[in-house]
Amino acid sequence: EIKPPANPLVIPQFCVRFNDIDNVGITGAHYAGFVMLGQHGFFAPKDYDINKYFNDHLTWLNLGLGLDSSHITVHEDAWAGGGNLGPSVEFHSAGLELSNQVYMQYDVRSGKPKELNIKVLDMGQGHERVPWFTQGQETSYETTFPSVVKKLRYLTAIKPDKELMKTFLPYAAWLNIDEVVNVDDAWKRVASKVGMNVKELKPHIQQQAALYSIAEHSRALLFTINDGQLPSNVGGGYNLRVLFRRAMDFIAAYKWDVNIPDLCKLHAAYLKPIFPELSEHLDEVKKILEVEAVKYESTRQKAHSIVERIVRKDVNAETLLQLYDSQGISPELVKEEAAKQNVTIKIPENFYARVAALHEKKAQVYETKKDVVISVPERVPETNALYFDDWHAPRFKATVDYIVDQYVLLDKTHFYPTSGGQLHDKGTIGPYAVVDVFKQGKWIVHKVDAKPKFKIGDVVEAMVDSERRKQLAQHHTATHIINAAARRVLGNHINQASARKTLEKGSIDITHYSRLTEKELIAIEKEANAIIKKALPIKKSFIPREDAERLHSTRIYQGGVAPGKLLRIVDIEKTDVEACGGTHLNTTKEAELIRIISSAKIADDVVRLEYVAGDAAREWGKMSERRSAEIAGLIKKTLNLSIKVTSRLLQEAADVFNVTVEQLPDTLQKFVQQIKENEITFRELGEVHSHKLSRAVSLEQLSQDIFDAWKEQRKELEKIQEKRAAEQMKYVKENSVVQLNADVSSLREIAQKFNQILLINSDGMFVFKGSDKQFEELVKLGAKGGGKELRQGKVDDVKKVLKSFRF
């Protein structure tokens, strides 16, 4: 969709790939994170000259690398991707692929080759291979990160066997999991060439590979985390967690004293002349990796009992894959635990490639979708959207272009359609209320409250609800302000995952590795309101995509990549720049006030913030003050506790019980009362049970404590009832009419086991199982109640029923 920054173009860029992680360290040439040197050209067919591109690269190999053509092997092939296809040429020397030129010529999306209008030269060259080839080191890792490899050799006391590596490396490519059918056979072939048996060769190479993998993975993690990505259990972050845990597994397996954040620091220092930005956020990278290390250790702890059960069964590749994907338990850990039980586990050589392939199929999609689709002729012109210019909602005139039932298309409109997580505008078109607005293709569709009487071609007067527009614009601009504030407070890794803006409140999902503390929330809110107070100008403009990316980087894509050649850029001066099509204020001061009302960790690497701005913030403030005082008084009265009740914690406390803030006082009272009643029940049953509420310091902590106490009581009562029911079963037979010392739950538990039964306790509560006719006889004796298979209720005269009722 966009023009290249230059034509022809040579561009180096750091890339990550995860489909052959198992090769890293083994072949001496593979990386999860590497610099790709791209050579590109975009030409009309008449200007497309494959011979020239081939000769240009051959000249570079001759003069740049000093390679004589007799030492270069050219392998012809074909390459396809993205619906395009073309011949390719791989350049090899001494068994190593140095580069690959692809000559894209055909569009194959239809299933048949079709000549491209623009033909493309697409050459890729792994940068790390060139210095390795020219310097003649044992592997490319020594040349790519010498300081880190040197440090690891010192920490691990592992010295390279140069003679062995010199013999092994020419055949290491035979172990490439992408190209080998049977890895075990490949190891045997390599071992025979080296002059060793597999049992001698493999442990030595794998130990070296572990050292190289730790060096490589730590660099890949440094680049990606510095770029704003987080290890997690979903999406692309899953692959980063795989890298981290693979490195940690090697460290644990060989009992090495290696710290990954320290290696990242060494990488950053070595790369500073080329990538100075890697040294700017090292504290943040360290914190993120330390959190990952805690999660890793937690997984190892819980893994012991899980693996202990699993290894008793047949453990195959699918079992290992499922354990890693669902529990985060690595195959190395399974193998380690299995060995303690004298069980041998075989780990597939391509295990991590299979993990990566599994997660390529999983993706998160954030979009605004309308179920309604109306039929509009293509001749109807595109709607001219006027809402981009100014958030103030004016009265305007427009021509009716098309009408379908209650759906109206105008030649131009100020009405914003539901999109980008922001709700639509409302207002009027003529005498009709606009109840919905949505985008369909090139048109903006207005739904009115009745089939209109005006006709196509009529000029109508329309007006947008200005109060609704203002509130939505405040919430949308607040999203950008909070995103920027969170990044300043929490770190450079903060990005927007998704957002929603309604009339009542807004929400933004930010990428972060842990729950936010009250201190952090206060700091973010304070920073957001400081941005408001500065009255910063908010510039809105349409810019070609390539210019927007060049000026502001790809960070403009918050919450997803915006489509189109032209991007609408919303620029809050020196604060935040995003590609966004929503309605936005003209200055930050117009947002007036922001209050963050709740925070929740909704995914492993995502935190959701809910907030209000403008009038909604002021109304929420008044409501929360009243509610806070009410709840503080309630807690003092019922529990004799003086608890900290802040307005923001109201929502978090309500979330504990899955109720609204308005329902929270009654819910708290109900749960506390139930706890007290349960304590009485325990005493009546002669059971000792007492759960004392902790001296919680916040409303959320107390709410969680109350909920946990209630839940624990419920479980304990169920156990007691089951025990009592089991004890009293000996008094009960089929067709019995029996009085038992048990509550209704226990009576039901016993009755389930019979076809015909009537059980009554001393309070007259009964449970009945039998026919409709038999139940009618019970009703004649004064029973009141009902049900389906099991009927329950109460009788007034227990003795009368026991004496008179029979099956």
Question: Could you describe each region identified by the protein language model?
Answer:
Residues K362-M463, E467:
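Conserved nucleotide-binding/hydrolysis modules and their immediate coupling elements
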Residues S330-D390, G421-A433, V437, H512-Y513, ...:
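Conserved glycine-bearing catalytic or ligand-binding loops at nucleotide- and phosphate-handling centers
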